[in-house]
Amino acid sequence: MEFQNRINSLRSTLSKTDIDTAFISNKDNIRYYSGFTGTLAFLLISETKSIIITDSRYTIRAQEECPDYEIYQLKSGDNWIENSTNQIKSKVIGFEGNFVSFNLLNQLKERSNNNLIWKDFSEQITKERIIKSEHEVK
């Protein structure tokens, strides 16, 4: 329930911007929004969908730890960026500019739909993370 509340809060924040989907790559933020404890994952969170992208080593863990998420399993040679963003039908994706490397951002742009716009939304995520649950404070 705690994770669903956080997702809903993020969705509310996104609705006040021109960003329709959040791309989350920082491990701490992935855990904050999903509970996922594996070492390789990305999240895509839109108004209606929550997708966790991970490889076959963590598929079962993702199913167990992230029941509110659709699982997108990475496969060799798969254009996961385009395929997963097409599932959400995004126009503008917010990314954590303070964590996404220049090279990763270029890959995201090159491998996604050409009409897709990528925008830094680090400030919004930082504000979201200020909110702490009782469990986090302990």
Features from the language model and the residues they span:
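Flexible, acidic/His-enriched mid-domain "rim/lid" segments that flank
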Residues: 2, 7, 48, 79-138
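N-terminal accessory/capping or targeting/presequence segment of soluble
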Residues: 1-86, 132-138
